[in-house]
């Protein structure tokens, strides 16, 4: 077990995002043996779109097993997330949306997490979709609205935004039938 821990620790310390994602996934799937690496995964760098799938599942599956300090650290990181506009001002609604994404993983674990989740969904007026979905879908058409919520687009890094736009498939059905 020590060899696995040491190897995963080196993956966390490496330069490649893919290896860091694999390390987070391993901690999630082998939590009992690797829980001593949780602190390594609880850093602001990983509360980002590129790590969303793996970290969200780690939080969702094991937050209740974290120490009080680890739980507080997660909340502190989430509360510190901000989305800024081009003019460098904080976009309150996009920031709230980004926070709800992470809070959705832990919202059912305590009154505090439920309260924070409700606070931010009140601001966004929407609950985030499950992180396993790479795009957002709806069966409701809203006149003159983008098929991808602006709050979601504002939370994306440049690379994620380009990927989201490039992966969008126009069905040719027009706005009425678009997601």
Q: Which residues does each predicted region cover?
A:
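Non-catalytic all-alpha helical scaffold/repeat segments
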Residues: 1-179
């Amino acid at each position: 077990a020590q060899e696995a821990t040491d190897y995963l620790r080196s993956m966390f310390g490496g330069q490649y995002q893919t290896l860091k994602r694999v390390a987070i996934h391993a901690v999630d799937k082998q939590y009992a043996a690797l829980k001593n690496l949780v602190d390594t995964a609880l850093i602001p760098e990983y509360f980002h779109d590129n790590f969303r799938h793996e970290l969200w599942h780690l939080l969702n599956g094991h937050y209740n097993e974290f120490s009080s300090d680890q739980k507080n650290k997660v909340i502190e990181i989430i509360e510190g997330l901000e989305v800024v506009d081009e003019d460098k001002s904080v976009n309150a609604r996009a920031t709230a949306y980004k926070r709800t994404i992470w809070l959705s993983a832990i919202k059912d674990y305590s009154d505090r997490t439920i309260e924070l989740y409700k606070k931010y969904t009140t601001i966004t007026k929407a609950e985030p979709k499950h992180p396993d979905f790479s795009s957002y879908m709806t069966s409701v058409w809203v006149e003159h609205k983008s098929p991808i919520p602006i709050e979601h687009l504002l939370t994306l890094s440049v690379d994620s935004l380009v990927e989201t736009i490039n992966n969008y498939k126009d069905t040719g059905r027009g706005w009425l039938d678009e997601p």
